[in-house]
């Protein structure tokens, strides 16, 4: 388990270091969704397997901090209360990076669990859409998406 934690943190540290605007945050998001939808990915093992409680807590705390640092680093305008990213996307300046990082981790964990059960990435994408809404790093979940199967398949977008 320690190996999966270390691998995820190494990848996240490298990838999140390059996130400087909403477009790059959306790219990070797509990559993480792809990792979580790949059954034997280290991300899947790190989030879904039980392990030593202190080890898991340390892993999640370190990942949360990487995400929070990234969110805090995104451009701000300060004066208007909105942030304008270089891609033309906006975010509110009053968004708490620490709370948002916790929300993103909760979306990754819960969304990936629901997506695994449904065999459909829609629940994970929906959870991340809401968590990342202040940064406009969302995906199009329009009518072209696949119909969900399984017990949560009756949910509609």
Language model: regions and residue ranges:
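Short, basic, alpha-helical segments at the C-terminal edge of helix-turn-helix-like DNA-binding modules
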Residues: 2-9
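Short amphipathic alpha-helical interaction patches enriched in hydrophobic/aromatic residues
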Residues: 9-16, 51, 112-116
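Amphipathic alpha-helical packing segments from all-alpha helical-bundle domains
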Residues: 10, 53-87, 98-102, 122, ...
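Hydrophobic alpha-helical connector segments
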Residues: 13-41, 101-104
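Amphipathic C-terminal alpha-helical segment
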Residues: 35-38, 90, 104-122, 134-143
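Amphipathic alpha-helical segments used for helix-helix packing
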Residues: 36-61
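Short, hydrophobic secondary-structure boundary micro-motifs
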Residues: 42-47, 94, 116, 143-144
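Intrinsically disordered, low-complexity terminal tails and inter-domain linkers enriched
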Residues: 76-94, 140-156
């Amino acid at each position: 388990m320690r190996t999966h934690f270390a691998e995820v943190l190494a990848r996240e540290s490298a990838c999140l270091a390059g996130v400087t605007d909403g477009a790059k945050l959306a790219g990070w998001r797509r990559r993480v969704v792809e990792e979580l939808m790949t059954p034997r990915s280290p991300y899947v093992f790190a989030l879904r397997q039980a392990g030593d409680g202190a080890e898991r807590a340390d892993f999640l705390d370190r990942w949360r901090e990487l995400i929070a640092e990234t969110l805090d680093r995104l451009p701000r305008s300060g004066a208007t209360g909105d942030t304008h990213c270089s891609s033309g996307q906006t975010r509110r300046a009053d968004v708490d990076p620490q709370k948002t990082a916790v929300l993103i981790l909760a979306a990754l964990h819960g969304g990936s669990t629901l997506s695994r059960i449904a065999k459909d990435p829609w629940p994970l994408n929906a959870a991340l859409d809401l968590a990342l809404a202040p940064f406009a790093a969302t995906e199009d979940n329009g009518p072209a998406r696949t119909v969900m199967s399984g017990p949560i398949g009756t949910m509609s977008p």
